[in-house]
Amino acid sequence: MMQPSIKPADEHSAGDIIARIGSLTHMLRDSLRELGLVQAIAEAAEAIPDARDRLYYVVQMTAQAAERALNSVEASQPHQDQMEKSAKALTQRWDDWFADPIDLADARELVTDTRQFLADVPAHTSFTNAQLLEIMMAQDFQDLTGQVIKRMMDVIQEIERQLLMVLLENIPEQESRPKRENQSLLNGPQVDTSKAGVVASQDQVDDLLDSLGF
């Protein structure tokens, strides 16, 4: 004896679920477009179990890189200031000497100070170069965070695809078909919602959502 098919107790609530899924899908589409990801991303290779932790990881790595760069700049600044101050002072003293040559003893002192400055320059520049290297190395976070963001975007793309499939499989036929037929003359060929996996382009996704009223 055949069992009667079980129908949803509240058809309106089922419709609300479909509407909410459609709205969420539309939001994801708009977000992808705003990020410049208009072209379809490759299908998800693997899911990220906890997107919140991944985002926190990206924020953490970015903050650490910024801190390393700022620390290096702050460490280098005194060395640059010292060289600038000493160079300006020596330049002024040499200008004064050429304008009015001084005694031999004072000239020797000027030469000695100049030689000391030249001897100190390599130490300052070496320290500064090390800090510049640290700033450059701090940028390696971009490779790691870029991979994480790419995986998250893949997952978002997969979620969008799955939500579209839910709409295709569950939208009431009597509600979706008239809308597609009414708009077919304006928008051209529409997506065949009777087949799975037919969403082939971004324009088709938009047309599908429009035809379903989202």
Curated annotation (Swiss-Prot):
InterPro entries: Chemotax_Pase_CheZ, CheZ_family_phosphatases. GO terms for molecular function: phosphoprotein phosphatase activity. One of its GO terms (cellular component) is cytoplasm. SUPFAM superfamilies: Chemotaxis phosphatase CheZ. Transmembrane segments: none annotated. Keywords: Chemotaxis, Cytoplasm, Flagellar rotation, Hydrolase, Protein phosphatase. GO terms for biological process: archaeal or bacterial-type flagellum-dependent cell motility; chemotaxis; regulation of chemotaxis. It is found in: Cytoplasm. The record marks Q147 as: Enhances dephosphorylation of CheY-P. Homodimer. This is Protein phosphatase CheZ.
